[in-house]
């Protein structure tokens, strides 16, 4: 009798273990399914529903607030060549501001009190954000080692995965098109590239690469709260490039192209050339 009782208890214990295992398996399945759901939701959250090349920005009412960021200046002269980069960017920014000031559709803004003052990129981005910008253009010049024949225009929009990437990419297309119409040769894929920093190493990536990466790009593009593009208007180390886009007349020519690109972005009619 005692033996039979022990066997019954063992049988019950065995049935209890099987039921518990089933519960654990069901809970595991639910947990894995829910985890996959969360992963898919996280992956798709914030992803663009329109392809970059088909994107068009939503335009509000003018006047539009345009931040013009003249690269370098003050204690940072930038690249040196046929011209000094900071002098070229200041001249271009000044000419672009003049066009925007005459056009009632725009309010030109800056990231520094003067072109001769020194400000870090993060400080310039903060100054831009404080002015509630609709668009930012950071003006720079390119350079190459002595003996290089490198020339041409290229620009860098905010990279894929960032909040303002598509608006930045659209603006970059307008800039590249306007510069090409002005006679510039376009570098890379249509004059548009991405930049990533891996520590102190800068990696250039063609705009055909759409993957989202964790590395940061240019600080001013990462930190500003609006579509933004950094433009390299010409190589300061190229006589031909500077004559066309970096000399006194060249800076004015570039500024006009930038102005027309801004007008194309906001779908306004440019003022006639003088």
Language-model segments: what does each one mean?
Residues 55-81, 137:
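Catalytic-core environment of secreted peptidases
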Residues 1-19:
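N-terminal Lys/Arg-rich, disordered targeting/topogenic segments
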Residues 78-91:
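Glycine- and acidic-residue-enriched helix-capping/strand-helix junction motifs
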Residues 14-25, 33-58, 90-274:
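Active-site-proximal helix/loop segments of hydrolytic enzymes
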């Amino acid at each position: 009798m005692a033996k039979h009782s022990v066997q019954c208890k063992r049988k019950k214990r065995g049935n209890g273990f099987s039921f518990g295992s089933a519960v654990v398996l069901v809970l595991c399945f639910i947990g894995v399914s829910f985890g996959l759901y969360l992963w898919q939701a996280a992956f798709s959250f914030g992803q663009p529903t329109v392809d970059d090349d088909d994107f068009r920005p939503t335009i509000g009412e003018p006047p539009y607030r345009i931040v013009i960021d003249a690269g370098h200046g003050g204690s940072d002269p930038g690249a040196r060549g046929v011209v000094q980069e900071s002098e070229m960017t200041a001249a271009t920014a000044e000419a672009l501001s003049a066009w925007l000031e005459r056009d009632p559709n725009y309010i030109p803004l800056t990231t520094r009190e003067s072109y001769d003052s020194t400000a870090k990129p993060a400080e310039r981005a903060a100054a831009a954000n404080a002015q509630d910008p609709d668009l930012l253009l950071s003006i720079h010049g390119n350079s190459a080692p002595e003996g290089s024949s490198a020339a041409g225009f290229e620009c860098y929009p905010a990279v894929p995965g960032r909040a303002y990437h598509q608006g930045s990419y659209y603006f970059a297309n307008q800039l590249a098109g306007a510069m090409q119409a002005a006679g510039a040769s376009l570098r890379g894929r249509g004059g548009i590239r991405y930049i990533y920093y891996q520590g102190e190493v800068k990696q250039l990536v063609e705009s055909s690469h759409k993957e989202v990466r964790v590395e940061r790009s240019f600080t001013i593009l990462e930190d500003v709260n609006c579509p933004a593009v950094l433009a390299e208007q010409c190589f300061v180390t190229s006589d031909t490039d500077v004559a066309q886009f970096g000399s006194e007349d060249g800076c004015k020519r570039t500024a006009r192209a930038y102005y027309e690109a801004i007008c194309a972005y906001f779908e306004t009619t440019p003022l006639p050339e003088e």
